[in-house]
């Protein structure tokens, strides 16, 4: 049953960066899609040997020579995947063209060179976001995370090179404990809500709903929260949904080997809190790249801070008095939502 509730959708989008419930949509005639995890198909992981086996098997089953590429960042997750690819496989690295943005290309080149891969840089400009955002909104029927613009551009460039399949390493953070800031403590219920919401809806929306009901199923005694279960059900699905949208839109087959895995035992939170996030992945990286130091973790670079520095929404739905205290990534959510609402009003969705 499709329910129309613009206020619900706006509130959930600014808080969680997506709307998990497929049956609640912004407007009549629009229907969005959310990633569905198939738990019964996941491989159990006990050690790095198991991780290697799954990576090798999934890539072997997926790989078509001259038609398969990898999105390679400067981080360890995609670097590990790169080490199992045949020589001369195409690998793409994003580079945002703006002042002060982290450049991962030199680190990614070390991985590509180590395994004789064909390394290509994809430059990202604000003009790409202006150009691609409308067509992504038309496809998704809902506003989205900014990573989708980069993924869609990568797909378009890959297709020009004859690539039909792309491998990514998104899921390692979620399966193996890479979100170390969210795993840094046993959160109090209210503190976790404040920490997790991308934007508290009441801060930026004139009309909004309280989104705390999303957290209530995870509330524990003594005002604690099962943050691990929440992250698995909400954060993981949000990220996997972004990748699904982008690749399906561009009709590209994609593989995330890590998303096919689950740990056979609980994460060792003490190791993570002592400075070893993704301890199994770090161990495997050191095995595959014995001559390289483990790099610091950084998110996929996006120059939203620079590109949206002076952005102020014009629509009546938004409280503009708070816009300047938002980060660039937070402003992206408002920019994308405003673009979506404008397109709807013009009949362009």
Protein language model regions, located:
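RNA-binding accessory domains that recognize and position tRNA/RNA substrates
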Residues: 1-67, 345-349
